[in-house]
Amino acid sequence: MRISNPKFLLFLVTFWGILIAFAPDTLTNLIDYTVFSLLGVLGAIFANSTGAGGGVVFIPMFNKLGFTESQAIATSFAIQCFGMTAGALTWFYHYKLEREPSGLWPSFFPVIKVSAIASIIGLWAVYGLDLAPPSSLHYSFSWFSLLLGIGIIFIALVLKPQPLHQTVQPIDWLMICVISLFGGAVTAWLSVGIGELLAIYLIIRRFDVNMAVAVAVIVSALTVWSAIWQHTLVDFNVYWQVVLFAGPGAIFGGVLAKAIVAKLSAKRLKIFFAFWLMVIGAVGVSGG
């Protein structure tokens, strides 16, 4: 069933209403959190149209609101479970209905399988071994995003178009595994990383930019779902009042993102992706 199906939407609204009705807080207090619905929409639109996780929107905002680091990361993961899942399902249906029948994106599922497994291993290696993040990780990741954004704009505007790659070469499999292991670890620390790194690599290697985004979104969704148990069952730090409103907003944003991407040419999508990388980098560097 597609998430835009009226029956599914009715179920979602009903389920959300039940959660509010049984929430251990007064309706008056909960109303104060409705503004986070917009944050969920915004984060999911950028996340699911570029492949970079919504945490790049959520974490800076949560830091400004005085969340603890654990609360910010856990709440970001929880919201992304809504938004990235909506985006992943939307991209999956796009592949099944429009790409697979034409024989396009032959590497779609193989890349997702390998990358998701490696990413989850990297993420749970951090949790299982209790690995602390490098002190300069966030700052370095921000510079990396900024410079890569500039590089992708150069590729899109200056270099002549070349034929797209359809098949994954042995060196690509090696790089995808390494990038995904590292990206999973970074995601454990920052709640973002795997989608951005994977999309960047696939775009640079001249795979279809829409496929790069779709793969990154789906791998990100699988990664955040594997992570949420650490922040709920093991060590609960989710700011649930925020998720109660930002989560449904993120679902809407995740669906809307695909419609936005459909309006962009491959070149414009690359530029949009690069612009978002530079925004991420600039915000991180200025806050570093």
Region spans (language model):
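A small-residue-rich subset of transmembrane alpha-helices
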Residues: 79-81, 217-232, 241-250
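Membrane-interface alpha-helices at helix entry/exit sites of multi-pass transporters
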Residues: 68-78, 101-107, 206-218
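Interfacial segments of multi-pass membrane proteins
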Residues: 58-71, 197-211
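Transmembrane alpha-helix interface/packing and boundary motifs in multi-pass membrane proteins
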Residues: 40-51, 180-191
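Juxtamembrane transmembrane-helix boundary motif
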Residues: 1-40, 63-65, 69-71, 88-184, ...
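Membrane-helix interface "capping/anchor" motifs
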Residues: 45-55, 205-214, 262-267
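Membrane-embedded alpha-helical segments of transport systems
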Residues: 77-87, 113-121, 125, 218-226
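Transmembrane helix boundary and interhelical junction motifs in multipass membrane proteins
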Residues: 50-58, 190-199
